[in-house]
Design a protein with these regions (language model features):
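Alpha-helical, largely C-terminal catalytic domains
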Residues: 1-185
Length: 185
């Protein structure tokens, strides 16, 4: 039942209808579906089931570590340490074979070296951009997010899919800069 706690970890991104903020369970589910539907846009051939599983567990450490907002520079200073400790505890609850498999997938996601991890990271970066656009840029506007912050956070997004990054930039980010929802530098 430990995994049920991800339903109570709320992110800074609003749902598409802007009615409330998204939780980690919704975020993971949304990206797992995206992996199935958008896998053809991966730069490299990927194992879709492996990518889905990676996406479903990638934020499970936030049960202990909490969600670190994408543009929270102070929070990022301790994020890795908090998440490693959380991974040890949470994956340690599983039988050893499952713990080893799941922890391996989590580590792979964090390292961003395999085609699956690169594509999963692309989706993890693009999904909140999609939601921010759909909600009228609400979170970006509330947090006074600047274009340079978004570009820095997404500097490796194209590694998983150049096509999806180009689409997200031109259809979600650029129009929100033009509308003033994202601050220009």
């Amino acid at each position: 039942m430990e995994i049920d706690k991800v339903k109570n970890i709320f992110r800074q991104t609003y749902l598409a209808d802007a009615s409330r903020k998204e939780n980690d369970a919704e975020h993971a589910w949304h990206m797992a579906i995206m992996a199935v539907l958008l896998s053809e846009y991966s730069n490299e051939k990927i194992d879709v089931l492996k990518t889905m599983t990676m996406l479903l567990i990638h934020d499970i450490v936030e049960i202990d570590a909490g969600d670190t907002y994408a543009y929270d520079e102070d929070g990022k200073k301790t994020q890795r340490q908090r998440e490693l400790a959380a991974a040890d505890r949470i994956f340690g609850l599983l039988p050893s074979d499952q713990a080893e498999y799941m922890r391996g997938l989590w580590d792979e996601f964090e390292e961003r070296k395999t085609p699956e991890a690169k594509f999963a990271r692309t989706l993890d970066n693009i999904q909140p951009v999609m939601l921010n656009n759909a909600s009228g840029g609400r979170s970006w506007e509330e947090k006074c997010v600047h274009l340079n912050q978004i570009l820095k956070r997404n500097e490796n997004t194209k590694d998983g899919s150049e096509t999806l990054w180009d689409y997200a930039y031109n259809n979600f980010i650029k129009p929100n800069v033009e509308k003033g929802k994202i601050k220009e530098d």
